[in-house]
Amino acid sequence: MLYYKLAVCAYGADTGRERRMTQRMKTVLGCIRRADADFSMIQPGDRIGVGVSGGKDSLLLLYAMALYRRFCKTPFTLEAITLDMGLRPFDVSGIQALCEQINVPYTVIPTQIAQVIFEIRKEKNPCALCAKMRRGALNDAARERGLNKLALGHHREDVIETLLLSLIYEGRLHTFHPNTYLSRSGITVIRPMVYLPEKHVIHVSRELNLPVVKSACKADGNTKRQEMKELLKNLTRTYPNLREYMLKALQNKEQYGLWNQKIAGIETTETEE
């Protein structure tokens, strides 16, 4: 069935439902192609690992990158990586089946992240530490498997929510960059879906019936990021174009665009925290 859907997206559709799916996938691929062009994400011979948590964002990224690989003029390889956080239940059989259907190698990496956070550290606000540990584990896994790039499924709203988090809780203007070289690990982290609105992620992942894995984290849905999501939703009711303008501000070369280094063709380098 997945191959059929890939073919529909690639070569056209007959029914109304197929045409809608084709158009939505074209939107997804168009956003990825634009990000790739703007931030020089993919180079010939890249070995790209896709971090797959089991959520809708990372699964759509995996699916879309497998399709993008067929049309991209730059040859690259893909591999999917999932971290076993130690949370239960943990069933990735659906992800495994998806990877087999789209011909992408799949690896599950065992970790003790949940044990460290909830049993040893007993963190009341675990998200920052969890994110740091997950980044480190993914970078290590990518390096050990001979990959040179790691693709993450952050979309447009993730970019804006991170900017709001930094502003409100840290007093600084900061968000993640679409293309970042990590000097310590030698891995480049790319985020091909930074231009893609979350509403498209929701629609397309449902349309494709991607095997979303429900999060087993006890902190899920009760985080500062969720607060920012609600804040952004409320602000958008008053200012409908807010999301577009905030993303535009990040790229504004005439002012202080936080992304203007890459727009100008200069690679951003960071060290892992």
Each model region followed by its residue ranges:
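ATP-dependent adenylation/nucleotidyltransferase module used to activate substrates
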Residues: 4-11, 17-163, 169, 199-207
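Catalytic subdomain that performs nucleotidyl-dependent activation
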Residues: 78, 149, 157-237
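Residues that form or immediately flank small-molecule/cofactor binding pockets and catalytic motifs
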Residues: 85, 111-113, 194, 217, ...
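The feature marks non-catalytic terminal segments
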Residues: 210-273
